[in-house]
Amino acid sequence: QVSNSISLGFCYLTLRQSPRLSKAQAQRIISIIHRSSLLETLPLDEDLITPSHEVLPGWSIPQGPENHEVPLPPQLTLLYHLPVELHTMAEQLKLRLATLGCELTLIFHDAKNWDGCRYLAQADMMMGDRLIGEAPEYTLEQWLRCDTLWPHLLTGAQYAHLQATLDAVQAQPEARSRNDALRN
């Protein structure tokens, strides 16, 4: 007997700030995803991918300014991995960005994580998902600490700062203190 169920998790899109993609352009792309009907147009089973304004339950996603005047780069590359539902999201994003003059090249990494992915250093954007499980804060901390994505996305100084911050969070004696520190 095979069981079908949907687990709580989150889909993420990370953007590498570089000469090809400025902070303002990255904010515009995030705005296109969160403030447009892009997520509602996904031809997926109901509730498989649903829009959210939270990273984890109770943790709001910071919203930058919506600026339609910021021109997008002429070309970008999106690297993404399983689950297969992200194929649909990637294709919809490609179509939406094309209407705005940005050609999005899609690269699919056929795995459930970034281990062994040789394109991480080249992509402008990376998309994947994480299951949350029983301990959302622990999941987030482990994702930030252990995922092979971060050393490719952050500078050495940024990555060292991230690790030092996570170490300081883990030094908190109580779970509530650790969770509060992780939020900040």
Give the positions of each predicted feature.
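Extracytoplasmic/peripheral linker and loop segments enriched in polar/acidic and small residues
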Residues: 39-42, 46, 106-114, 141-184
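Residues that cap or initiate secondary-structure elements
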Residues: 8, 19-21, 84, 112, ...
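Local pocket/hinge segments that shape ligand/substrate recognition
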Residues: 1-68, 150-163, 184
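Structured segments of extracytoplasmic/periplasmic soluble domains
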Residues: 18, 28-36, 41, 96-100, ...
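Pocket-flanking alpha-helical
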Residues: 1, 14, 113-146
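Soluble non-cytosolic domains of exported or imported proteins
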Residues: 19-24, 83-91, 156-160, 172-176
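Short clusters of hydrophobic/aromatic residues that line enzyme substrate/ligand-binding pockets
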Residues: 52, 95, 140-144
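Ligand/substrate-recognition segments at binding pockets and active sites
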Residues: 68-129
